Every structure is written in structure tokens, then in C-alpha cells.
UniProtKB/Swiss-Prot annotation:
A GO cellular component annotation in the UniProt record: membrane
Gene name as annotated: PDIL5-3
GO MF annotation terms: protein disulfide isomerase activity
Function description: Acts as a protein-folding catalyst that interacts with nascent polypeptides to catalyze the formation, isomerization, and reduction or oxidation of disulfide bonds.
The protein, known as: Protein disulfide-isomerase 5-3
Domain (Thioredoxin): residue spans on this chain: 133-263
Species the sequence originates in: Arabidopsis thaliana
Length: 483
């Protein structure tokens, strides 16, 4: 057995009786300074240990989200109707997706970007429309030509006023004209405007009555609107919306639609019967947006190759006057990749202040077609996108903290001979930025901490010894002189 006496002999820290030690004011002051300096260096070392240390590298894109990329957007068009707003995607590989509706929502807005109705569903407006057989036979005008003055008077006089807003240069308006005039004559014979007085079919030439067409937010030709009791506005759960007809444009379909509108109305009192219910004859009537603007929001999935996201007016059975199209828009949100929660993004910005500065470059910006640009103006955005990924090596394993796509944006306006559009041209970089978080080891922190405390203690002891010996030497010299 090892005796306690022998064990004590290896003690590195032998104690000196307190009675044999001497305290001094200089030693006390130096001890206080040393203690404060230790605390300061300890705080600095702790801050350095807790600080995120990163390395940045540029590598070939190794995205975990495959060959497709998600684009989220929320864009407001003050002068583009939801009736015709279309979201299209194309790329250099030949992909062309027109009028995407599955992941896109449209809401009518006013010129001040305020919502004016519920979500607009354009399914009925986009089916293949039957115009009947083309014929060169001319029919007598059955529909009444309307002007701004006569429109107001007749819309207040007839319970039902069905109006065809058209343009003479429009191919689809000319296709509709024979069927429309024939149907108008049939309706006039069945429901005499003077004797019956329940319904009237009219025409508005938008080249001669542009103010009337603009007031009714006509953007595509022909547009068939139904006006009830002096106004095309109907109350529906707090939202005012007008009715538009999107059905077939042959004579029989138009007559059937009008008869379905007239059926619930009493011929003498011109009041809607209490048991009047909608039926299949009016199934192609749809409440349209009351204002001429539209907020388009949602997302699309695109291939990771250069491509275009295009928002424009589109219809397979309407024509548009390109000189009157205004593609001004305000971008509320536009981003690439999966949506990042605000909390996660806030945490990452706290750790990495330079992260997330360019993932929403277009957000909150307005692109307005000023008058000096003239007509037929397309607004283009050129977006160059690069992926940034942050990974950590804590707990001995490497895992991804966040993935985001940042982009630069350059915008311009250009006059075109074609229909104006809002185009977002995106080009993805084949490289990605990899930010690696390298945590410091706890053993390294403890080692530095011991070095700091021990070093300060030792240096303070040396300084105290030098000062004490110097004072003693000075006293001895003074004592020798006195002798």
C-alpha cells in the first residue's frame, strides 16, 4: 500500500501557511486587474466559440429537387381582365404549356389593386366554341345597334338586354355576326320588343363606341354580356359581378340561352317568378369580374433550363386590340424553389446575415407602361438564378439547413408588332454556392480557456514579483545611503 506521506510528495500545489505570506496593495491592485482581464478574455473566447464559422465554395449543382424547379408568383395587372389572363410556360427544349390553371388562381381587382370579387374560374370560357357552319348568306339586322345614350335607356327599359360587343376587324366577331343576327330575328318574332318587352338583343361596335366598351371592361371581341334591370351587376355574397356568355355561338345555342333567361320572367309584370330556377339553357352564363384588373397568383414547375414565364391575354375564340392592351403590373412576390417559412429565414439571417438578400429582387416593384412608351408595349424581365445551399457538420454528421434560389433581375420595355405580354425570362446557373458551417470543437474551447486563465495568472504573478523585488531593491539602496 502506498502511504499517504509518499502520495503527498507528488503534490504540485504545496500550500504555504497564510501566516508566512504577506499581502500588499500593489498585489491586490494587480490581482483585480488580472481578474477583470481574465473575464474579458473569457467572454471573447466564448463569443468566438459560439460564432458560426463558414466556408464558401462554388460547385456543380447537385440539387435534391430533381430536374424541375418551382416558381412562385403573385402579380397584379390593373388593366388585364381575369377573363382572358393566361399563364404560359416555354423553354429551350421545346416545352410549351399554355393557360396553366391547375396551380394558378385569378382574382379580379380594381385600378388601385384592391380585390373586387371572389376567385375567377375560367374553365367555361376556354372550351371549344361552336360557331355553326360558315355562310355568306346575309340576314336582315335583327339586333339593335346601341350607342352610349340608347344603351342606358334600353338597359333600364328591358328586364333582359343581351349585348354583343364586337369590332368589325375581328375575325371572330364576323364569324358570330350571321348567327347573332339570325338569332336576334328569331327572338324578335317570339318576344316582340313592343308587345312582350321582356328581352332585347343589341350590338355595340367598339370602334365607334370605345368609351361604352371601356366602361364595361371589354378587352376581347366578341364579348356577349347579359344586363338585368338596367345594370350588369348582380349581388353575390357581397361581391358585385356581371354575367357573360361563354357558350356556343351558333344560332340554336344563342336562342336557347336567351329563352332560358326569359323563361322565369312574367310576361305582364316583368318580374321574376318565385319558382324561377336556372336550368341547362343558361349553364354557359358565368359571373365575370366587374373590374378590368386581375391578380394572378400561384406557382408553376419548370425544367432547369432557360425558359419563359409569360402572362398575357389569350383566348381561342376572341380577338384583342393590341394597341389597347396595357400590361402594366405590380409584383408582390416572385421567387424560385420551395417556399421558405419566415421563421426559418429569420433564423438563417441571424446566423448568416448575407443570406437571403436576393431571393425576392422583384418583390414590391411596379412596372407601369407610361404614355411616352406608346402602344403595343411588352414588359420583359431577365432573371439569372443561382442556388445557395447551407449545410452544417454539427454532431459529426453533415445535413442541409436551407436551400434557396437567389436571382438578379433586369427589366425593360419594348414595342412589339404582336400582342403585348409580361415576360419573365429565367436562366439557371449550372453551378451552386455551397456554404458549409464548421463548428468549433469543445476541446479546443477548453484548451484556449485554460491557456487564457493560466497565462494571465502567470504573467500577473511575474509582474507582481518584478514589482515587489524592485521595491525591495530600491529600499535597500536607500537604506545603504543613509548608513
Amino acid at each position: 500500500m502506498v502511504s499517504s506521506t509518499k502520495l503527498k510528495s507528488v503534490d504540485f500545489y504545496r500550500k504555504i501557511p497564510r501566516d508566512l505570506t504577506e499581502a500588499s496593495l500593489s498585489g491586490a491592485g494587480l490581482s483585480i486587474v488580472a481578474a477583470l482581464f481574465m473575464m474579458f478574455l473569457f467572454g471573447m473566447e466564448l463569443s468566438s466559440y459560439l460564432e458560426v464559422n463558414t466556408t464558401t465554395a462554388v460547385i456543380v449543382d447537385k440539387s435534391s429537387d430533381g430536374d424541375f424547379l418551382r416558381i412562385d408568383f403573385n402579380i397584379s395587372f390593373p388593366a388585364l381582365s381575369c377573363e382572358f389572363a393566361s399563364v404560359d410556360v416555354s423553354d429551350v427544349l421545346g416545352t410549351n404549356r399554355l393557360n396553366i390553371t391547375k396551380t394558378v388562381r385569378k382574382f379580379p381587382i380594381d385600378p388601385h389593386l384592391r380585390s373586387t370579387g371572389a376567385e375567377f374560374h375560367s374553365g367555361l370560357a376556354l372550351h371549344n366554341i361552336n360557331h355553326g357552319e360558315e355562310t355568306k348568306e346575309e340576314f336582315p339586322d335583327g339586333a339593335i345597334p346601341l350607342t352610349s345614350a340608347s344603351f342606358e335607356a334600353l338597359s333600364h327599359h328591358f328586364p333582359i338586354l343581351v349585348v354583343n360587343f364586337n369590332a368589325p376587324w375581328c375575325y371572330w366577331s364576323n364569324r358570330l355576326k350571321p348567327s347573332w343576327e339570325k338569332a336576334a330575328n328569331i327572338i324578335k318574332q317570339r318576344y316582340d320588343p313592343e308587345a312582350d318587352g321582356r328581352v332585347l338583343l343589341g350590338n355595340v361596335d367598339c370602334t365607334e363606341e370605345p368609351a361604352l366598351c371601356k366602361r364595361n371592361h371589354i378587352q376581347g371581341y366578341p364579348s356577349i354580356r347579359i344586363f338585368r334591370k338596367g345594370s350588369d351587376l348582380r349581388e353575390d355574397h357581397g361581391h358585385h359581378e356581371h354575367e357573360s356568355y361563354y357558350g356556343d355561338r351558333d344560332t340554336d345555342s344563342i336562342v336557347k340561352m336567351v329563352e332560358g333567361l326569359v323563361a322565369p320572367i312574367h310576361p305582364e309584370t316583368h318580374k321574376v317568378a318565385l319558382d324561377g330556377k336556372s336550368n341547362d339553357t343558361v349553364k354557359h352564363l358565368k359571373k365575370g369580374p366587374v373590374t378590368g384588373g386581375c391578380r394572378v397568383e400561384g406557382y408553376v414547375r419548370v425544367k432547369k433550363v432557360p425558359g419563359n414565364l409569360v402572362i398575357s391575354a389569350h383566348s381561342g375564340a376572341h380577338s384583342f386590340d393590341s394597341s389597347q392592351m396595357n400590361m402594366s403590373h405590380v409584383v408582390s412576390h416572385f421567387s424560385f424553389g420551395r417556399m421558405i417559412s419566415p421563421r426559418l429565414l429569420t433564423d438563417m439571417k441571424r446566423l448568416l446575415p448575407y443570406l437571403g438578400l436576393s431571393h425576392d429582387r422583384l418583390d414590391g416593384k411596379a412596372f407601369i407602361n407610361q404614355h411616352e412608351f406608346g402602344a403595343n408595349v411588352t414588359i420583359e424581365h431577365y432573371l439569372q438564378t443561382v442556388k445557395t445551399e447551407v449545410i452544417t457538420r454539427r454532431s459529426g454528421q453533415e445535413h442541409s439547413l436551407i436551400e434557396e434560389y437567389e436571382y438578379t433581375a433586369h427589366s425593360s420595355v419594348a414595342q412589339t408588332y404582336y400582342l403585348p405580354v409580361a415576360k419573365f425570362h429565367f436562366e439557371l446557373s449550372p453551378m451552386q454556392i455551397l456554404i458549409t458551417e464548421n463548428p468549433k470543437s469543445f476541446s479546443h474551447f477548453i484548451t484556449n480557456l485554460c491557456a487564457i486563465i493560466g497565462g494571465v495568472f502567470t504573467v500577473a504573478g511575474i509582474l507582481d514579483s518584478i514589482f515587489h523585488n524592485t521595491v525591495r531593491l530600491v529600499k535597500k539602496v536607500e537604506l545603504g545611503k543613509n548608513i
